[in-house]
Design a protein with these regions (language model features):
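Short, small/polar residue-rich loop motifs at catalytic or cofactor-binding pockets
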Residues: 86-88, 178-181, 195
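C-terminal tail/sorting-segment detector
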Residues: 200-210
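Conserved beta-strand and immediately adjacent loop positions that scaffold enzyme active sites
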Residues: 11, 111, 182-184, 200
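OB-fold nucleic-acid-binding modules
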Residues: 1-172
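Structural motif
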Residues: 16, 116, 188, 203-204
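Residue-level detector of functionally pivotal "anchor" positions at catalytic/ligand-binding pockets or at interdomain
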Residues: 166-189
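Terminal short linear interaction segments
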Residues: 97, 198-201
Length: 210
């Protein structure tokens, strides 16, 4: 189990085999990393397409055993494409080496994204801002571990369960630099010139002396 609280709601996520689900405020204690066995009566509900289980009049802990454990659930190494395909819903995942970006939707308020080429998902720092997402730098590469626990306007959201860490560059910057080095060269009149041309030129959108 992974347990957190959000505005008075107890969010408990459990995994069985390759499937996970949220147990939302069932009314009895299920500590972090505990193992649940038995059965419990609940209602299945959906929040923007994400399933969760919630208490009803018959919910109690009489037929369920909660065994505390120190062994934490291992995150699944996933990709942005996996989440866009709705894999690992409600499960604990790690996404490595994504590029961070943000978009201002209201003055001083931002949506945050993990990008992989043309694809992206949102990062929602829901649980006490443990991920430190607001302090990340646009264009930098990071790793995030969290729950694929929400979908916002059709876009998957990962909810960090620990601080976002620095990733490893995949060499894209070197490819970009090489492309700039090989960019065509123009003089100030807009005529294409060769590397032997002397004077002020425009290359890759920048003026320079050659």
């Amino acid at each position: 189990t992974f347990v957190n609280e959000y505005k008075g709601t107890i969010n408990t996520y459990v995994r069985e085999g390759d499937t996970a689900i949220e147990l939302r405020t069932l009314g009895f204690n299920m500590p972090v990393n505990s193992i649940l066995t038995g059965k419990v009566k609940v209602d299945l509900k959906y929040n923007y397409g994400v399933p969760y289980l919630t208490a009803n009049a018959g919910t109690d802990d009489e037929s369920i055993t909660v065994t505390e454990s120190n062994e934490a659930a291992e995150p699944i190494e996933a990709t942005i494409a996996d989440l866009l395909a709705n894999k690992y819903l409600n499960d604990l995942v790690t996404i490595k080496n994504f590029t961070f970006s943000k978009e201002e939707y209201q003055t001083g308020k931002f949506n945050y994204y993990a990008n992989d080429g043309e694809q992206k998902i949102m990062i929602y720092d829901k649980f006490n801002k443990v991920g430190g997402v607001a302090e990340l730098t646009e264009g930098e590469v990071y790793n995030v571990t969290g729950l694929y626990g929400a979908i916002f306007k059709g876009t998957p959201e990962i909810l960090p369960t620990q601080k976002v860490t620095a990733g490893t560059s995949t060499g894209i910057n070197n490819i970009t630099t090489s492309a700039a080095d090989n960019a065509p060269i123009f003089n100030l009149a807009g005529q294409k010139v060769g590397k032997g041309y002397k004077g002020v030129v425009i290359k890759a959108g920048k003026k320079m002396i050659q």
